[in-house]
Amino acid sequence: MSSRILTSHFSGLEEFLQQHAALLAKSTDGTVAVFANNAPAFYALTPARLAQLLELEARLARPGSDIALDPQFFEEPAAAPVAVPMGKFAMYAGWQPDADFQRLAALWGIALSQPVTPEELAAFVAYWQAEGKVFHHVQWQQKLARSVQISRASNGGQPKRDVNSVSEPDSHIPRGFRG
């Protein structure tokens, strides 16, 4: 167990080697910090102080309440490794970004408020399949993040308009226009 103990009693290593019993007896809390080369080397404790600290550690290790929580809520399933091609590769039809893509995009400075939609991913894959360029998996993800960011910003954050919808005429006449 590595820890730091607060004490107001300290000694140099040489002094401690010569009179360790007297220094420990003189300390009020049973603890002496021993320094070597102006840095704490170790702590010397009386048996009573050691027993106090061990009892305190045991008390802190016990649960504070008798409520037992179901461990299934704290066990995260191990992520199954996705087969990502090693090195550079050309874009292929079944390519998927990593499961934590949004977090990675945020690390790259691209904040995506929503996950990539299947339509956005399909458009990206189709474009880069036709290009035939090769990049590493991380580079493809960075390109996807930038592509999604740019396409979402071009619409002002609005979803793309359905080109197949039939528009209805507006019968409202704005103020200042004759009707």
UniProtKB/Swiss-Prot annotation:
Gene Ontology CC annotation, any one: primosome complex
Basic and acidic residues composition-biased segments: 159-173
Keyword DNA-binding: yes
GO biological process: DNA replication, synthesis of primer
Pfam families given in the database record: DnaT (PF17948)
Keyword Mitochondrion applies: no
Region (Disordered): 151-179
UniProt-annotated stretches for the region Binds ssDNA: 84-179
Coiled-coil residues: none
Keywords for the protein's UniProt record, in alphabetical order: DNA replication, DNA-binding, Primosome
Annotated segments matching region Required for trimerization and to bind PriB: 1-83
Domain description: The N-terminus (residues 1-41) is not required to bind ssDNA or for homotrimer formation. A slightly longer N-terminus (residues 1-83) is required for trimerization and to interact with DnaT. The C-terminus (residues 84-179) binds ssDNA.
Known partners and oligomeric status: Homotrimer. Interacts with PriB. Interacts with PriC. Component of the replication restart primosome. Primosome assembly occurs via a 'hand-off' mechanism. PriA binds to replication forks, subsequently PriB then DnaT bind; DnaT then displaces ssDNA to generate the helicase loading substrate.
Recorded family membership: Belongs to the DnaT family.
Function per UniProt: Involved in the restart of stalled replication forks, which reloads the replicative helicase on sites other than the origin of replication. Can function in multiple replication restart pathways. Displaces ssDNA from a PriB-ssDNA complex. Probably forms a spiral filament on ssDNA. Binds single-stranded (ss)DNA. The minimal binding site is about 26 +/- 2 nucleotides (nt) per trimer. Two DNA-protein complexes are seen with 55 nt-long ssDNA.
Protein name: Replication restart protein DnaT
Organism encoding this protein: Klebsiella pneumoniae subsp. pneumoniae (strain ATCC 700721 / MGH 78578)
Lineage of producing organism: Bacteria, Pseudomonadati, Pseudomonadota, Gammaproteobacteria, Enterobacterales
